[in-house]
Regions:
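Positively charged n-region of N-terminal signal peptides that target proteins for export
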Residues: 1-7
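Extracytoplasmic metal-acquisition and chelation regions
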Residues: 7-9, 17-178
C-alpha cells in the first residue's frame, strides 16, 4: 500500500509539473506577448541547429518527433497548421522528408538548396543508385547547411544578425575541430 501511495504521489507531482510547464496546446502566433518569430523545422536535427545559431531569438516548432522515420512520416493536420503559421520553415531537402515534400517545397527552405549534384553522395536503394539525403555524415555538406540556415535566420531576425553570425562562426569552428 505504501508503494502505491508513493507512486501516486510521484505521478501527481509529475503531472502538476507538466501542467505548469506546458503551454496552451502549442504556440500561439497571435499572442500579443509572443515576440519571437516562429521557425518550424522538420526534424530534431534541424531543431538543434537552429537553437545553436539563433538561441532564444526565435521560437522553434518541431514537426517530426525524435525517433520517427522522416522518410515515412505522414503529416497530420496539426503539422500543416504549423507550416502555415510559421514565419520560416526549414527542412532537409533531398527528399529526406519523403511524404511531406510537396507541402514543404511550397512554404519552406531546404537547407540543402546550395548543394551541387557532384557534392551529394548516392546510396543503393532496392538495387538503384539514389541521392543520399543523409548529408550530415559529410562535414563539408553539413557546414553548407549551417551556412544556409544562418542566412535564412539572419533575414528573419535582422536585429540579431551579428549574434547569429557570431554563433555561426563558433559553431563552424566546433565542426572544424571534429
Amino acid at each position: 500500500m505504501t508503494k502505491i501511495l508513493k507512486y501516486l504521489s510521484v505521478l501527481a507531482l509529475v503531472l502538476i509539473g507538466l501542467t505548469a510547464c506546458s503551454s496552451k496546446g502549442g504556440h500561439q502566433t497571435s499572442d500579443v506577448n509572443h515576440k519571437e518569430p516562429v521557425v518550424t523545422v522538420t526534424t530534431s536535427f534541424l531543431n538543434d541547429m537552429v537553437k545553436q545559431l539563433a538561441g532564444d531569438y526565435v521560437k522553434r516548432d518541431l514537426i517530426i518527433p525524435a525517433g520517427e522515420d522522416p522518410h515515412l512520416y505522414v503529416a497530420k493536420s496539426s503539422d500543416l497548421k504549423k507550416l502555415q503559421e510559421a514565419d520560416l520553415v526549414l527542412y532537409h531537402g533531398l527528399h529526406f522528408e519523403g511524404k511531406m515534400v510537396d507541402a514543404l517545397e511550397a512554404k519552406g527552405t531546404a537547407v540543402t538548396k546550395g548543394f551541387s549534384k557532384k557534392d551529394i553522395g548516392t546510396m543503393d536503394e532496392d538495387g538503384e543508385k539514389v541521392v543520399d539525403p543523409h548529408f550530415w555524415f559529410d562535414i563539408d555538406l553539413y557546414k553548407k547547411a549551417v551556412k544556409e540556415t544562418s542566412k535564412e535566420l539572419k533575414e528573419l531576425v535582422p536585429d540579431h544578425r551579428s549574434d547569429i553570425a557570431k554563433n555561426t562562426k563558433e559553431y563552424l569552428a566546433e565542426l572544424d575541430d571534429l
